[in-house]
A protein has these predicted regions:
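Juxtamembrane/membrane-water interface recognition
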Residues: 13, 19-22
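Extended beta-strand/beta-hairpin segments
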Residues: 23-77, 88-169
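Short glycine/serine/threonine-rich phosphate/pyrophosphate-binding segments
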Residues: 85
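Generic detector of N-terminal low-structure segments
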Residues: 5-9, 25
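Alpha-helical metal-binding/catalytic segments enriched in His/Glu/Asp
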Residues: 82
Length: 169
């Protein structure tokens, strides 16, 4: 191998190595989340997540100003949003068109402090013409058992169940 060919080879190897390092660094950054929550006044906090502002507060009956949802309710919304994104994405890939899709989350709190959820149930509600039950059941089951990271965290410490309703009123 001539010196020029060897030099080109070393340059190519170095570039590939650098590119791999950049991709690995990018992956590492994507696997970490960081947020900042700022106290505004009284019991009101503000959190900015990727440019989306969320106000967190207590109800007036709890000494707050009711300017935003409560933290535990946001946890339920995160669970519903996570599994909902999974399910609707899988249904699209399965070429299933739904007209309406809701997820209701019922969770029961403990009676003693710290108040935490002791059970959780997700109710997936679908509406549409000629919806294929098997595909819907498969999408929900895959999200519930394999893909939704928020539900995986919940299931590690709380019994979580689900129900599917198709074209029910």
């Amino acid at each position: 191998m001539s010196f020029c060919a060897f030099s080109r080879y070393r340059t190519k190897v170095a570039l590939n190595c650098l590119l791999r390092r950049q991709i690995t660094t990018k992956r590492r950054n994507m696997s970490k989340h960081s947020i900042k929550t700022v106290w505004k006044e009284n019991n009101t906090f503000s959190t900015n997540i990727d440019g989306h502002n969320i106000v967190i507060d207590l109800g007036e009956d709890q000494g707050g100003q009711d300017q935003g949802p409560r933290p535990k309710q946001l946890m339920l919304a995160a669970a519903a949003g996570c599994t909902g994104l999974d399910v609707i994405s899988m249904l699209r890939k399965m070429r299933v068109e739904v007209e309406h899709f809701d997820i209701k989350v019922d969770a029961e709190l403990t009676e003693e402090h710290p108040l935490k959820y002791k059970t959780m149930k997700l109710i997936y509600e679908f509406k549409g013409d000629d919806l294929p039950e098997k595909k819907i059941e498969r999408a929900v089951k895959l999200s519930f058992e394999n893909y939704c990271g928020v539900l995986a965290m919940y299931k590690s410490c709380v019994p979580v169940s689900y129900e599917i309703k198709i074209n029910e009123d």
